Amino acid sequence: MRIPNPTLKDIAAEVGVSISTVSRALADHPAIPQKTKQRVLKAAQKLNYRPNAQARALRNSKTNTIGLVIPNLFNPYFAELAAAVQNAAIDAGLYTLLGISNDDPKGLIQAVEIMQHQRVDGIIAVPHIGTEKELTALAKQNVPLVLVDRELDIVPATSVSTDPAEGIKAAVSMLVTGGHESIGYLAGPQDTSTGVDRLEAFRSACGSFGIDQYPMLLGGYVEEQGYVGTQELLKLGVSAIIAGDSMMTVGALRACHEHRLTPGFDIALVGFDDFPVFQLQNPPLTIINQHVSTMGAKAFEELHKLLRGDSAQHKIKLPTTLIVRGSTPPKDSASDSPGQGGH
């Protein structure tokens, strides 16, 4: 009859050795003979023994758990980021405790406090303006900390984010070369480093092509802001739109659909982040790709270095690339659609 929750004592009784011998055998202690270790492991497997992670953490002062704080899970970008971090952690034999900040400074601070109470070994967080003081204090307590996706320059911690300049410049270049003179931009929130950096990259790209007038709408990283912003840009008569975020891209698609405009025929549209839903559009959407899975894996790699004693701080910027598909034809060919809004 199988014991419901076997303990070290049960294994010791099964093998006929002391509890301390079982404990050291499971820890692969060099003083325990290999034959005894094999007997203990066989008994543990037979009894379906599972070590108590909390008890082991109290002994070792480590929980083998990292914390990950992201704004939300409904944005596929953050869902993919979380999956990448967790998969990398699993490969390293670590657990991941997930916290949701709801893109609110108080939510981020609360999530970090909970993780500290749970004694996580280190934290990866998507930061928010208004949390500089708390994150700086965390870093100064020598808590291994990596900021991902966004930066807070005054926080003394490693950060992993993307440089939007290359991808956005390639998008503007493609549109200008294709004859688009009125390019609208859906800008993200200016209280995030990503929103600021992407807007600056767009302005710089336009300037490099001699464009000093460009329609632009500021909004949040939510579908509704992309929807409303696209409606306003369409009123201004733009022939092309670049969305500064994945959720804003979804909103832009919804607005185009309601106006019976098909990206690739009636208007050129460049989205952000390469998610399957954008590839399934007809025609598929041209995308500025951040390679989010690579970013998540890199963030964990940097945290893992800190957990192993590397105290060096790094500011890592990963490149963005443009994936050209059917939603951004030259201006003249876009006007040759088989019928306004006929798709």
Annotate the PLM regions.
Residues 38, 47-114, 118-122, 200-203:
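Amphipathic helical "hinge" segments at domain boundaries
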Residues 2, 46-52, 106, 126-128, ...:
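Short gly/ser/thr-rich secondary-structure transition/capping motifs
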Residues 14, 19-24, 58-74, 174, ...:
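Short beta-strand segments enriched in small/hydrophobic residues
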Residues 1-3, 46, 87-92, 140-147, ...:
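Bacterial carbohydrate/catabolite-sensing allosteric modules
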Residues 8, 40, 85, 111, ...:
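Aromatic/hydrophobic pocket-lining residues that form π-stacking "cages" and hydrophobic walls in ligand
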Residues 1-64, 329, 343:
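N-terminal helix-turn-helix DNA-binding module of bacterial transcription factors
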Residues 130-139:
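Active-site-adjacent beta->alpha loops and helix N-cap segments on the catalytic face
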Residues 55, 109-112, 135, 172, ...:
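Short hydrophobic/charged patches on amphipathic alpha-helices used for structural packing
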